[in-house]
């Protein structure tokens, strides 16, 4: 009996170790696929606009393992593209839909293609979550965001909170504005909603933004709707009620909420207009 117990303990220990190795391997592969829009990439920032490289059209076969998508190109070839989107992409990853890919020549990348957009009824939808931070920063620097003018510096990925990094930190003298940016792709009946899946990380960011307000800083939750068919923004209470509850609490505690849509075509993307927010 004791021998069997020891064997079971060793088996469970080995199983946990194996699961840990698989998880670390998945994270490493994800990091290998990451890239910067400013370094060794074909993207160009022109004022407040990000210009796409020559996009390649195809048809989505399937998205899998979260970061991969098989796409059939117009020439009949099937390629595997990097899907830079950690969300569920609810209603934005339907097989058979037209998609647009960029090609990257960085020799360090295992996947040479990146999934940039999908064509949905009524609008193109930007699927690349690397785009929003760069686009918002470029728009602020070009003074295209009237809510944020007069700041002396804009820094990205600044450490704050509980081992977190704020997307943008705007500063002028002693005044600091913490900006957290979320990519929104889900629209239902003209209403943009976030999140498209339960997000403990997003919940943590809301708590940390409130902490900054208590310390005398300005905090903003910015939702970038990467499509052109939304007339209103609200939290997705039916998907993640805890997030919606915390967002309303954050607003009560002084966190500002801002939503913008984009102007999006096969040439590039830019901020378009503010969308009313209903929390």
Q: Which positions does each model-derived feature cover?
A:
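Conserved catalytic cores of phosphodiester-cleaving nucleases, focusing on short active-site segments
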Residues: 58, 166-196, 209
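Short, positively charged and aromatic/hydrophobic N-terminal segments
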Residues: 7-10, 17-20, 24-27, 35-46
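OB-fold/S1-family single-stranded nucleic acid-binding modules
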Residues: 109-121
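Short aromatic-glycine-enriched beta-strand elements
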Residues: 66-70
């Amino acid at each position: 009996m004791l021998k069997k117990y020891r064997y079971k303990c060793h088996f469970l220990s080995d199983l946990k170790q194996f699961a840990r190795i698989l998880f670390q391997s998945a994270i490493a592969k994800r990091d290998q696929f990451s890239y910067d829009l400013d370094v060794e990439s074909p993207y160009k920032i022109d004022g407040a606009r990000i210009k796409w490289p020559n996009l390649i059209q195809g048809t989505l076969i399937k998205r899998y393992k979260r970061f991969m998508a098989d796409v059939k190109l117009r020439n009949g070839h099937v390629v595997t593209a990097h899907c830079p989107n950690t969300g569920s992409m609810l209603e934005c990853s339907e097989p058979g839909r037209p998609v647009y890919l960029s090609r990257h020549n960085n020799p360090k990348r295992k996947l040479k293609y990146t999934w940039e957009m999908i064509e949905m009824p009524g609008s193109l939808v930007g699927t690349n979550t690397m785009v929003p931070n760069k686009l918002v920063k470029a728009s602020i620097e070009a003074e295209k965001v009237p809510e944020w003018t007069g700041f002396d510096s804009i820094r990205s990925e600044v450490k704050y909170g509980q081992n977190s990094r704020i997307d943008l930190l705007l500063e002028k003298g002693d005044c600091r504005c913490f900006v957290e940016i979320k990519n929104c792709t889900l629209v239902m009946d003209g209403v943009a909603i976030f999140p498209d899946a339960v997000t403990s990380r997003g919940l943590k960011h809301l708590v940390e933004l409130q902490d900054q307000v208590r310390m005398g800083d300005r905090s903003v939750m910015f939702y970038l709707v990467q499509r052109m068919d939304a007339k209103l923004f609200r939290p997705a209470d039916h998907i993640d009620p805890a997030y919606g509850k915390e967002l309303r609490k954050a607003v009560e505690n002084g966190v500002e909420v801002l939503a913008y849509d984009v102007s999006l075509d096969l040439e590039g993307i830019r901020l378009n207009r503010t969308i009313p927010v209903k929390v």
